[in-house]
Amino acid sequence: YNEPFHVARKMASLDHMSGGRAAWNVVTSSFKAEAYNFGREAHYDHEDRYERAHEFVEVVKGLWDSWDDDAFIRNKESGIYLDPSKKHQLNHEGKHLRVRGPLNVPRPPQGYPVIIQAGASDTGRELAAATAEVVFTSPQNIEAGVAFYNDVKGRMEKYGRARDQLKILPGLSATVAETDEEAEEKFEYLQSLIHPEVGREI
């Protein structure tokens, strides 16, 4: 829950402040309670969330393209601050979003801050293949990890993207102890604290 203009502005500002080291983790929100804080009576359904997210990313990138890299001249002697011919009006009108632009921040140093995504569902994988540069994943075994890798990479061509434009970063959940036996006992104890009904409700 956010507006593309706000995200584009915040990420562009962070990219400027960090010298081109900003990244944006695109999250579609999972909990219906979040909707109540943003003027909605119900959460978007799964398909709509990812469809909106795809459009959202394209709008944010369009806002980052509001200005050419050299649009801001800032010449005190001439009194010229910017070259208006290097401004690009977005004028986006889509199914979920309507954004005029331009962004009121210069183009980020990276052009586009790094876009990250972590969806594991079919629609999440499509979003990753279409828009992301980095994908977080947490497969339960090597075979599942290889299958996820090949599946997401295999979807990229239809979006006009090369496979090497996306990095997939597997997660690791470690249980640390002095011995294997102690680690397994600790893991089983932690698993016992999970209440199935609470998990389903969340």
Located regions from the model:
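Active-site-proximal loop/turn and secondary-structure-junction residues that shape catalytic pockets
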Residues: 1, 28-32, 64, 121, ...
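Active-site mouth loops of central-metabolism enzymes
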Residues: 1-5, 41-43, 47, 109-122, ...
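Hydrophobic or amphipathic alpha-helical targeting/insertion segments
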Residues: 1-37, 44-47, 52-56
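Short, acidic/polar
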Residues: 7, 117-130, 189
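Conserved, mostly hydrophobic/aromatic
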Residues: 14, 24, 60, 115, ...
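Acidic (Asp/Glu)-rich catalytic clusters
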Residues: 15-21, 129, 157-163
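Hydrophobic faces of well-ordered beta-strands that scaffold small-molecule active sites
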Residues: 20-26, 113-118, 133-137, 166-173
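An alpha-helical appendage that flanks or caps ligand/catalytic pockets
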Residues: 47-110, 143-202
